Amino acid sequence: MRIIKNSIFLLLFCSLSAFTQENDFQTWYSVSLNKKIIKKTNLTVKTGLRLRENSSLYAKQFTDVKIKRKYNKRISYAVGYRYINRWDIALNISNQNRFYADVYYKNKLSKRFSYAVRNRWQTQGYLYEYKMTLRQKFALDYNIRKTKLAPSIATEYFLTLEDGINKLRSTIALGYPLAKKLDFELAYRIQHEFYVNNPETLFIFEGKLAYDL
């Protein structure tokens, strides 16, 4: 447990202090529908849009389908597919596919603090060119007494065999249930790139809507 807490704060510190060459402000939006299909198994369909260049141009649009199964109260696993449209600087569109598998672990640190770890193995690319990436995300949630607000922090690294860790994300988020089956989350994220031409630091505002069918 202590190792996990130290890892969260270490990665958060590293991602906030990393040096990069270019900056951009982006906004990300997503809407997801969740449906229980059988016992302990949910289907999630998610669509998202991302804007770049100070949120003035399209960067990415995607549709994601995921099946997640609960193994026990702490461990879950999932498989998913994402179809992605990407716009380059000249606004030319290219398509990518992503296939991924997740393993989740969650537990409580105390009565009001809980943590979660997500390990993701993904392969993404074009028809003949795919790249394998390991992503590990650490999240810490706090249950505020007598309120429905749900604050959280998270940090995630991206690792490839060729480059090692080539991307770090740090996120602060605040969730709120708008209705019984409708949740909203607003987040601020900083993303750093490494070992690429013209590495960027992205400052991101993200809005999410999730509805349970």
Label every model-predicted segment.
Residues 1-25, 213:
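Bacterial Sec-dependent N-terminal signal peptides
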Residues 21-78, 87:
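Start-of-domain marker
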Residues 31, 63-65, 101-103, 136-138, ...:
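Membrane-embedded beta-strands of outer-membrane beta-barrel proteins
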Residues 39-45, 73-79, 110-115, 146-151, ...:
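Repeated loop/turn-to-beta-strand initiation elements of outer-membrane beta-barrel proteins
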Residues 47-53, 81-87, 107, 121-125, ...:
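Transmembrane beta-strands of outer-membrane beta-barrel pores
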